[in-house]
Amino acid sequence: MKLLAVRRLLRIQRVVIRYRLDDLILELPMLPWWLRLLGATLPWRWLPRRKLELTRGARLRLALQDLGPIFIKFGQILSTRRDLLPDDIANELAWLQDKVPPFPPELAVKRIEEQLGAKIEQVFARFEREPLASASVAQVHAARLKSGEEVVVKVIRPNLEPVIRSDIAWLFILARLAERVSSEARRLHPVEVVSDYEKTIVDELDLLREAANASQLRRNFEGSPLLYVPQVYWDWCRPKVLVMERIYGIPVTDLETLRDQRTDFKALAERGVEIFFTQVFRDSFFHADMHPGNIFVSTRAPWSPQYIAVDCGIVGSLTDEDQDYLARNLIAFFKRDYRKVAQLHIDSGWVPAETKVNDFEAAIRTVCEPIFEKPLKDISFGQVLLRLFQTARRFNMEIQPQLVLLQKTLLNIEGLGRQLYPELDLWATAQPFLERWMRERVSPKQLLRNFQQQVEQVPHLSQMARDTLERLSQPHAHNAPPPEWKGSRHDWLGRLVGAVLLVGAAEVGLGQQLEAWPAWVMLAGGVFLILRR
């Protein structure tokens, strides 16, 4: 392992020198003066080197490609963090392609047989040794099950884990070094960025997780005309092998074939937007890797086109609170209610509670007003989120990984939609959905569901009260800091009182020792205190 790490370090050093990334690093404004001086004394900087007529973004992209698949995927993820990177570098990194030569079919067959515990001929009536596709983490083969179903078999590359561990270790070393030498780097949280990447790559190595994600997404859109997700054949799925239904669709980027079958491009673009908002707000479970290589279009009904999604290795979800605040933020933004946008960021805990709402409102207005000089159909929804994140970052916003996944997915969907139909007005498509969702949040059915969830907590009230009294009875309890309640915007004291009223209402109502009206008053008061925001 140590020998592998040393060899990898030498390889990284050669690539840095070849693409003159040392120049790029030394130009960083966050670099302290003493490190610039140290960098200027590096031996190779005094030797003649050929001049590269490439932009800094292109040099970084080519270097990551040379360093191999793990660095390529890291660059792809980094390209989505436009709140951290300059636009020219982020745009260049977006061109990184996760394509590598396939590994020998003999190794694929061996790994499949090891995982399934059976010979390939015992499981499949036909297995095509030539892969359909190959990427840095896995490759895909076509096959047919003994029961007759046409399937694809995805298999993880052999001997990948040691390389990943080594590369991730070096990324962490570089991130920690950056945090140690620069306060500006610490503000960008490089260790957190690498940690997010580590989680992503580890998740992609577990094909049972991908199978579970695909099954969930398929169930969410069962019978839907919007999206089809291939069936998972669980009997033949293992941590390193995934067997799914083979789909036959048109790649979403093959515009010529889509035109030939007379696809309704306007409907196709609008359905992409509807799929995104349905996943985020109805299901709180969204496919977070919706780049064109993972999206196909069904050939069945071109006048009512249906998407087909594959590769569910990366998914995202939002809490109920984040869903609510995101929807209200977007609606307030498009109404130019910047005060409300600022207040929502503070209330949600996305920026520190001590943030001055007037200053934050002014910063948002400065960034966003120029955007509204364009017609609504020309406004990028993804860029709106990006600009909000960039502005909030100046106010020490801690951007959650799920929100980054959301912004990346929205940019992909929006870019794809406008490629299919340039006149796509994303706001006109999204606004009715968001407003309907907000209305449903306060519908009697939803309020009853919320009430039932709160009532489930009633049996725990006596223990909560006992714990509180014990804490207050302890010496120095009044000098101790208050307990840290989770959720910055919930009035837990009010909810506790509301729950007590509910218990009282139940006691009065069931005891039947008094008239019924006190129970109704207590019930109404309890419901109000529990459900109020």
UniProtKB/Swiss-Prot annotation:
The chain crosses the membrane at residues 24-44, 510-530. One of its GO terms (biological process) is ubiquinone biosynthetic process. Keywords: ATP-binding, Cell inner membrane, Cell membrane, Kinase, Membrane, Nucleotide-binding, Transferase, Transmembrane, Transmembrane helix, Ubiquinone biosynthesis. Residues 126-494 form the Protein kinase domain. Pathway: Cofactor biosynthesis; ubiquinone biosynthesis [regulation]. Its main location: membrane. It is an enzyme of class 2 (transferase). It is found in: Cell inner membrane. ATP binds at residues 132-140, 154. Its EC number is 2.7.-.-. The active site is at residue 289. CDD domains: UbiB (cd13972). It comes from the Bacteria. GO terms for molecular function: ATP binding; protein kinase activity. GO terms for cellular component: plasma membrane. It is a multi-pass membrane protein. Belongs to the ABC1 family. UbiB subfamily. Is probably a protein kinase regulator of UbiI activity which is involved in aerobic coenzyme Q (ubiquinone) biosynthesis. This is Probable protein kinase UbiB. The lineage of its organism: Bacteria, Pseudomonadati, Pseudomonadota, Gammaproteobacteria, Pseudomonadales.
